[in-house]
């Protein structure tokens, strides 16, 4: 199982608009291998947050990252909200409860 964690800093004061765009862009898309996805706002920095997704395999996650949906719909819609600080981590899940 693979976890994809993206941390980003949004342009000041744009969280609500970003959250609406995220929900509108992500909802209803059937993505092979995707087990679940979460969007979390930092409680100490309202302009910072995390997108976390859980995948069956590394290959499924990589296929998503290379897909037309990701490159042509999701990224172009969400990227303009970021203030330049944006990092994605890809993790092999070692423990689950």
PLM regions: where:
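Short S/T/G/P-rich N-terminal loop/turn motif that feeds into the first structured element of a domain
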Residues: 1-50, 54-69, 76, 80-97
